């Protein structure tokens, strides 16, 4: 956006106002909310068909902030998985502020957050070291998620990945065990090996225990 609406007036989006906008977004992110900016284009009388080229000189009119809280069973499931020796890692496209808040809510200690732009510039050897030292990865693209899982597998880990969105499809396919939920998007469910029908994530713990008992 090039302009912002304030007090029913459209004014230029100056550096000072832009900083205020970003501060508001950061505050909302810190509360675990994802934020979408809403802008409109004024003076459109002469435009018959709209295209990407028209998405400029727009007026910021507000935000949409929405919360996607973790499942109530998430914290207990993570504790139990760790107790059974499962190394729990977060791979997400969300930014680091939202991710920190969610990790705090589920009781997962964050020792370090590795961002997608840093993953991109790492060699496979560097990433191989980083995946052992890092338990939270944020702002990841679908291919970056898949690459991290591939590196973990190459290090000898058996990797399970749980996801329910379009951006999780590649990672679900790459993992040794791809896990989705019955409310996930079609491509995620099609890419998964297992689809959870129960709402409680404790079923993951039950699966680990049952799988190990089969090997005894």
Model segments located where?
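Short, well-ordered beta-strand core segments
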Residues: 137, 178-180, 194-195
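Cytosolic catalytic headpiece
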Residues: 1-166, 173-174
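Non-transmembrane, extramembrane segments of multi-pass ion/lipid transporters
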Residues: 125-128, 153, 173, 183-216
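Short, hinge-like loop/turn segments at secondary-structure boundaries
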Residues: 55, 105-110, 179, 198, ...
């Amino acid at each position: 956006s090039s302009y912002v609406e304030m007090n029913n007036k459209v004014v230029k989006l100056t550096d000072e106002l832009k900083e205020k906008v970003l501060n508001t977004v950061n505050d909302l992110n810190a509360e675990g909310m994802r934020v979408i900016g809403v802008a409109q284009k004024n003076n459109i009388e002469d435009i018959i068909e709209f295209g990407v080229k028209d998405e400029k000189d727009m007026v910021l009119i507000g935000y949409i902030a929405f919360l996607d809280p973790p499942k109530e069973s998430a914290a207990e499931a993570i504790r139990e998985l760790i107790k059974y020796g499962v190394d729990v890692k977060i791979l997400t496209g969300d930014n680091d502020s939202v991710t920190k808040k969610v990790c705090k809510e589920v009781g997962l200690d964050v020792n370090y957050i590795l961002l997608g732009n840093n993953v991109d510039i790492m060699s496979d050897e560097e990433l191989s070291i980083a995946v052992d030292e890092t338990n939270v990865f944020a702002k990841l693209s679908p291919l970056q998620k898949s690459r991290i899982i591939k590196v973990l597998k190459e290090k000898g880990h058996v990797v399970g990945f749980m996801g329910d969105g379009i951006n999780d499809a590649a990672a679900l396919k790459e993992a040794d065990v791809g896990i989705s939920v019955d409310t996930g998007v079609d491509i995620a469910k099609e890419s998964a090996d297992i689809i959870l029908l129960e709402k409680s994530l404790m079923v993951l713990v039950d699966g680990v225990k049952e799988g190990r008992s089969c090997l005894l």
